[in-house]
Amino acid sequence: MENELKKDFTRRLSQCNSGEMIVIIYDIFFAYVDDIRQAHCTGDHDGQKDAIRNAQSVLDELIGSLNFSYPISHNLYKLYMFCKNELSRAMYENRLDGVQEAEHIMHRLYTSFVEVAKQDKSAPLMKNTQQVYAGMTYAR
């Protein structure tokens, strides 16, 4: 993942609420999927393995944030684990079909979380962060 993209994710995370945070985590997953594809196309097997591990770490973060007191969390857990297994299969078979399957599932979930995030009017999670306006920062 490029440094500029990392900075963008950091900025977005510093200003998001809880609903937006999940969307940003999904965006990070998709950035790693792009890294997987790029490494595969260039024949960089080690880079591909690293990108797959990074994508799996994002899935681990999503799994860790599940609240199992809600029934939907059990379904999300199964989907996230399936995606992790597909990424593992892609790593060991050196093919992209498992990556594509995981990306497809995650994209369908992503569209739902985007809609939920639009309805979330809660306050930002981080306090005392700088506000960014068109590339300029202003202290609160």
Where on the chain are the PLM-derived regions?
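Short terminal interaction segments
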Residues: M1-Q15, Q100-R140
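Short, solvent-exposed segments of well-ordered alpha helices
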Residues: L13-V23, D46, Y70, H74
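Short terminal alpha-helical segments
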Residues: G19-Q38
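Membrane-helix exit/interface motif
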Residues: R37-H40, L62-N67, M91
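Solenoid-repeat scaffolds in large eukaryotic assemblies
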Residues: Q48, A55, V99-A102
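Short, solvent-exposed, charged loop/turn and helix-capping segments
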Residues: V58-L76
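Long, amphipathic, charge-rich alpha-helical segments that form helical bundles/coiled-coils
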Residues: S73-A90
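Amphipathic, charged alpha-helical scaffolds that flank and support histidine-based chemistry
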Residues: L87-E103
